[in-house]
Structures are given as C-alpha cells and as structure tokens.
C-alpha cells in the first residue's frame, strides 16, 4: 500500500460525539504505525427553520429551530495492512456517519 492515502470523512449532529470518534480513529491508526493528519474541522452546516406559533393572525409569534451538522476529515498517510484491518474492526458511535475513500 505504498504511496496511498486513506481519507475518512466524519459527519454528526453532536460535536462531542464526532470528536470522540475522531480520537478513536487517530489512536487506532497511530497504534498500528501509520501517520495521521487531522482531524481537520470542516465548516459547520447550520439549518434554521422558523415556525409560526399562532394558528391565526399573530405573525410576530414565531419559534426558531436549528440543526448543526459537524464535519471532520482525517488523512491516514502510508497505511499498512494492520491499519486497514484495525480500522475495519473499529466500532464507532451510532450517530456518526463515516465515509472512507482510498486515494
């Protein structure tokens, strides 16, 4: 696996959960002897939704809700077979979306 990189993108609604998962990935990769760059925080996507509270005429009565999507990216440089096996066996939290790309 010479001259290869593994890109791991993490996405979650809870920033503590994504940071804990990124830490587990970094620890696992370093334990197997690979070099890790990251976790690099990507811009947070904030979606806001405004809902009218009053069912009739009160336009001033509104509630606002927002959801924040946090993202991190990790690069594992020069991975070996142990690194790939350890990452495949790694159990992450249920609220974290993981995308893995081999370049």
From Swiss-Prot:
The keyword DNA-binding does not apply. PROSITE patterns: RIBOSOMAL_S10. Keywords: Ribonucleoprotein, Ribosomal protein. InterPro entries: Ribosomal_uS10 (IPR001848), Ribosomal_uS10_CS (IPR018268), Ribosomal_uS10_dom (IPR027486), Ribosomal_uS10_dom_sf (IPR036838). It comes from the Bacteria. Gene3D superfamilies: Ribosomal protein S10 domain. One of its GO terms (cellular component) is ribosome. The keyword Ribonucleoprotein applies. GO terms for biological process: translation. GO terms for molecular function: structural constituent of ribosome; tRNA binding. Part of the 30S ribosomal subunit. Belongs to the universal ribosomal protein uS10 family. Involved in the binding of tRNA to the ribosomes. This is Small ribosomal subunit protein uS10. It comes from Xylella fastidiosa (strain M12). The gene is rpsJ.
């Amino acid at each position: 696996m010479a001259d290869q990189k593994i890109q791991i993108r993490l996405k979650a609604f809870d920033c503590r959960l994504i940071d804990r998962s990124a830490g587990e990935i970094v620890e696992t990769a370093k334990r197997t002897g690979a070099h890790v760059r990251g976790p690099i925080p990507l811009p947070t996507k904030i979606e806001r939704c405004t809902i009218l509270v009053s069912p009739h005429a009160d336009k001033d009565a509104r509630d606002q809700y927002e959801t924040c999507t946090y993202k991190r990216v990790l690069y594992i440089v020069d991975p070996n077979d142990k690194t790939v096996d350890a990452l495949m066996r790694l159990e992450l939290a249920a609220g974290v979306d993981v995308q893995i790309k081999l370049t």
